[in-house]
Amino acid sequence: MVEKEEVSGGGGGISEEEAAQYDRQIRLWGLEAQKRLRASRVLIVGMKGLGAEIAKNLILAGVKGLTMLDHEQVSPEDLGAQFLIRTGSVGQNRAEASLERAQNLNPMVDVKVDTEDIEKKPESFFTEFDAVCLTCCSKDVIIKVDQICHRNSIKFFTGDVFGYHGYTFANLGEHEFVEEKTKVTKVSQGVEDGPDAKRAKLDSSETTMVKKKVLFCPVKEALAVDWSGEKAQAALKRTAPDYFLLQVLLKFRTDKGRDPTSDSYSEDAELLLQIRNDVFDSLGVSPDLLPDDFVRYCFSEMAPVCAVVGGILAQEIVKALSQRDPPHNNFFFFDGMKGSGIVECLGPQ
């Protein structure tokens, strides 16, 4: 158990009640990391299935405050993956319909709702938060909010789920963090140890905290990689196809003002193929990187994929706010068909 004087004293400590509530995670990532979380306010934009997963994880982690922003109404399709919304809430605002269950997860967190369109928010609105996470947003909005966050030293995240596929992206600017490392000890040669005793050994019982720094690029640059260069062509073979799938789906969202839906499967599938060809042509890459059957696996939000991607995204937000452990720099892609995920660092060469 955390010592009483550590948690209830001055200097930004946490209460005994909070220490009991968060005892397990304090053991996991330490008291200082938990203090940073308890001082952080987070904005989540888009309360569909992925937004619900992120909100749930951050509320349970114990941030100071969380604001759920969404100007859209609950649709019957939302009920398939959005567990914070009650069945009879169709037609209500998505954020408002999520509030009761979200707050009940952890009364110690100040959970708020905002029903205004994100595009109408002034820059000053975002400065109220330590981290901003966008879902269900257009490419233009993602780029605009990322730029606002960068100017104001706010940690920026975005992510989405499209059928079996999902992604996350982070721009933390110049981010400092600490990482726990096992100490390397030099063991002197002894009679019982033999000649190998001179080699350096890892002593798992002793660890040290190492400070590190990493630099992130804006999402605009990450989505505008020039694939024409020699180095880029070599990297192209190692790049996850999901990066290019994301480009196609963001273009679809921009053109149609929505994501592909099963209600108009044939029409949307045909349009996705056309957008794939147009996007790949503009990027200067072959459409063969994304075979035609991709259209079968990117419709609607799937609850299991939301759970995985939402868990990863919330974990990255916690790591960034607590300044503990290396963050994903900068994309994470999840392929539900393969049951695997990959971290990709994409941006200026």
From Swiss-Prot:
InterPro entries recorded: ThiF/MoeB/HesA, ThiF_NAD_FAD-bd, Ubiquitin-activating_enz, UBQ/SUMO-activ_enz_E1-like
Compartments where found: Nucleus
Biological pathway: Protein modification; protein sumoylation
GO cellular-component term (any): cytoplasm
GO molecular function: ATP-dependent protein binding; protein heterodimerization activity; small protein activating enzyme binding; SUMO activating enzyme activity
Residues annotated with N-acetylmethionine modification: 1
Ligase keyword on record: yes
Family membership: Belongs to the ubiquitin-activating E1 family.
UniProt-recorded name of the protein: SUMO-activating enzyme subunit 1
GN (gene name): Sae1
